Amino acid sequence: MRKVWVMVLVGVLAWALPGSALAEDIWAEHGMVSSAHRLASRAGAEILTLGGNAVDAAVATALALNVVEPNASGIGGGGFMTIRLAETGEVVVLDYRETAPGSATKDLFASEQAKTEKWSISGGKSVGVPGWLKGMWTALEKYGTMTFAQVAAPAIRLAEEGFAVHPMQTGIIQDELERLMAYNDPATLPFLDEGLPLAAGKLLKQPALAKTFRLIAKKGPGVLYGGPLGEAVVAAVNKAGGAMTLDD
């Protein structure tokens, strides 16, 4: 088994904790997982207990973050991964940040109309071509020991069974409610309950996301890059005013 140390930048969303919680030192002999959400960290730790290495655990954690903090992490975005190979000390960096579609120009957001309508923040023009899935898949293939299906299992379980919404998450849904309603059919949004943000403590279930992860596990990243999932992304982006193609 190839030994690695890994640090994944997955879009941290944190809130203030009591001073006593921050002061406590925690030690572990064989491995430790830290992320923006305890359920995502638990997913990574589960993979370690099943014999996975650090990269396997990192990908499992990132997949679970897609479920528990969908506003900040996941398949529609991108990121970086820094890996240190324990055997050689070599440091490897994977860059899978999202990129601008081929139709974008350097002055796309420079016009007065773009500034007034906030093209860089809202709508299809603000959406980059996602690199996250390709990054996760590449990390697993090159440095992991487990399959996508294996590391995605905790995230799929979370998406299907649901988890209790945090009060901050309810606030984020409320803050983004106007944009969510503008670009989506409210009836399809799992974040709403009769048109209102899910209240803190309510279960958030995302069966469509679980189905997506299962499809990727079965068919590979090609379902997004050139496949039916990619077609759906392109259609949604362009419907919202963007200009993305499947070639992107």
Predicted region positions:
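Noncatalytic scaffold domains of N-terminal-nucleophile
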Residues: 22-42, 46, 54-55, 59-226, ...
